[in-house]
Amino acid sequence: MELCTILTMKLRMEGNNIRLRLKKSDIEQLKKEGIVGETVAFSDNLYFYYKLKTNQHDQEINATFVRNAVQITLPLSIANTWMDTEQVGIQFTLDSGLIILVEKDFPCKTRDDEDKNDTFQELALNNC
């Protein structure tokens, strides 16, 4: 299992869709390390992992599920454009029909108790 720094990336799965939402700190880690991920512990010996990785050799977005781990891999050029601009998200449909959406995390105006220091406030009005 490939190790990665654990931050606060969010995973949402609905139907045949996977959505990852990254905060600013997650994106900084992805730029620095090339990978960011989270672990969900169901018990002492049962874990579920989800990871987002960049790869300079890949030409297409890819998703795998191996050893209890969902891994989304973005070509480095696509990831860099998204990370370094105001582009909100990347959406891609795999041949299997799986829809992948990777997006920047914005605060929701309806959650007054949410810590909004690590979200992209400047674009939030158009994306919640």
Q: What role is predicted for each listed range?
A:
Residues 46-60, 64-65, 102-114:
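A short, charged
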Residues 23-25, 32-33, 75-77, 103-105, ...:
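Surface loops and adjacent helix of pleckstrin homology
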Residues 2-5:
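Short, positively charged and aromatic/hydrophobic N-terminal segments
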Residues 34-56, 120, 125:
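A low-complexity, Ser/Thr/Gly/Pro-enriched, surface-exposed linker/loop concept
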Residues 87-128:
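C-terminal charged interaction modules
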Residues 23-43, 82-93:
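Extended intrinsically disordered, low-complexity coil regions enriched in Ser, Thr, Gly, Ala
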Residues 11-13, 18-22, 70-74:
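Short, structured motif recognition centered on aromatic/hydrophobic residues
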Residues 59-94:
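Mid-chain, well-packed structural core segment of small domains
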